[in-house]
UniProtKB/Swiss-Prot annotation:
Organism of origin: Clostridium botulinum (strain Eklund 17B / Type B)
PANTHER family given in the database record: HEAT-INDUCIBLE TRANSCRIPTION REPRESSOR HRCA (PTHR34824:SF1)
Gene Ontology molecular function: DNA binding
Keywords, comma-separated and alphabetical: Repressor, Stress response, Transcription, Transcription regulation
Protein name, UniProt field: Heat-inducible transcription repressor HrcA
Gene behind this protein: hrcA
Function in brief: Negative regulator of class I heat shock genes (grpE-dnaK-dnaJ and groELS operons). Prevents heat-shock induction of these operons.
Length: 343
């Protein structure tokens, strides 16, 4: 049996209705709400065929139909219509661009997670850049006044750390240029996890005569190493959002979801993607705890190098069109912000 145009229109109407109501859909509902040009009896027969073909399911003998995983997949791949963002959503994204333009990467990522969770009402999980695996791209000391310097440490993943350094007397600009050259010869292209006591002692020898400055420099170096060790691998916002959906009134489904949200290893696996946007529905998620949800994932980049992934987790009946439009726009702006910082 092939799926003809009429069946496709009926399936599309059923999925749209179920996404927005959460109630199993009957033939009368489709006949009343959607102008398909056929009566409820014809729609009922077509729905039976769609169920036989695996696109619909009937949760209870006396209830209407709901989309199956196969039905959702056809909808996402072929039937879903693009949805424009609302003026309010556009305004919030513009404000996000302004607010994050000059922030450090980890703070940008946190704000991105918060905004995505707010606009989609889903749980957002972001895999952060692995700081301890990053390489130092630059470490610069800049003079503020006669007793104050600022150190700026930048990694190849775009993570930037600023620290204020207080000394009795700052070096001259000429001396500072030489000191920066020495520091960068020693540290640039070193992986952060490679900066050990031996490297620190070598740097101390290189900076003989600038003991006060070297000792002051140890603090930002230590903070960078500590942050690398403590840096969270995953950031989660809106963890409770998913429980606003009635699907998770079922205690067993709620337990499965809680188990998933607390399983970082599984979340990292489920976020893997090498595409702009990946949509996995139900059992496509290949983790038992995720078989009743959908996960939408996308990469984000710094300097055109992928450095992390973003995931949205929700029930299978999420508003795919709306969520994908929001995610695509925010990921695009996140990449623009990070790539501008890399220049």
């Amino acid at each position: 049996m092939t799926i003809d145009d009429r069946k496709i229109k009926i399936l599309q109407a059923i999925i749209n209705d179920y996404i927005h109501t959460g109630d199993p859909v009957g033939s009368r509902t489709i006949a009343k709400k959607y102008n398909l040009g056929v009566g409820s009896a014809t729609i009922r027969n077509e729905m039976a065929d769609l169920e036989d073909m695996g696109y619909l399911e009937q949760p209870h003998a006396s209830s209407g139909r709901v989309p199956s995983n196969k039905g959702y997949r056809l909808y996402v791949d072929s039937l879903m219509e693009n949805q424009l963002l609302t003026p309010e959503e556009n305004l919030k994204i513009k404000q996000y661009i302004i607010d994050t333009a000059m922030l450090e990467v980890d703070k940008i990522v946190r704000q991105t997670s918060s905004l995505l969770s707010e606009l989609t009402n889903l749980t957002c999980v972001i895999q952060t850049p692995s700081v301890n695996k990053s390489f130092i791209k630059s470490l610069q000391l800049m003079k503020v006044d006669s007793t104050t310097l600022v150190s700026v440490i930048i990694t190849d993943a775009g993570v930037m750390k600023n620290h204020i350094i207080r000394v009795n007397s700052t070096p001259t600009i000429e001396e500072l240029n030489k000191i920066n050259a020495v520091i960068n010869r020693r540290l640039v292209n070193l992986c952060i996890e490679q900066i050990n006591l031996q490297v620190i002692n070598q740097l101390k020898e290189d900076l003989q005569g600038y003991d006060e400055l070297f000792n002051a420099l140890l603090t930002p170096l230590y903070e960078t190493l500590k942050n690398a060790a403590d840096s969270p691998d995953l950031i989660m916002e809106g963890a409770t959002n998913i429980f606003n959906y009635p699907e998770y009134n079922d205690i067993e489904k709620a337990k499965e979801m809680l188990s998933l949200l607390n399983d970082k290893e599984s979340l990292r696996d489920l976020l893997k993607t090498n595409k702009d946007i990946t949509i996995r529905i139900g059992e496509e998620n290949y983790k038992p705890q995720a078989k009743e949800c959908s996960i939408i994932a996308a990469e984000y980049s710094f300097g055109n190098r992928p450095i992390g992934t973003i995931g949205l987790i929700g029930p299978k009946r999420i508003d795919y069109s709306k969520v994908i439009s929001i995610m695509a726009e925010i990921v695009k702006e996140l990449n623009n912000i990070l790539n501008n910082q890399s220049k």
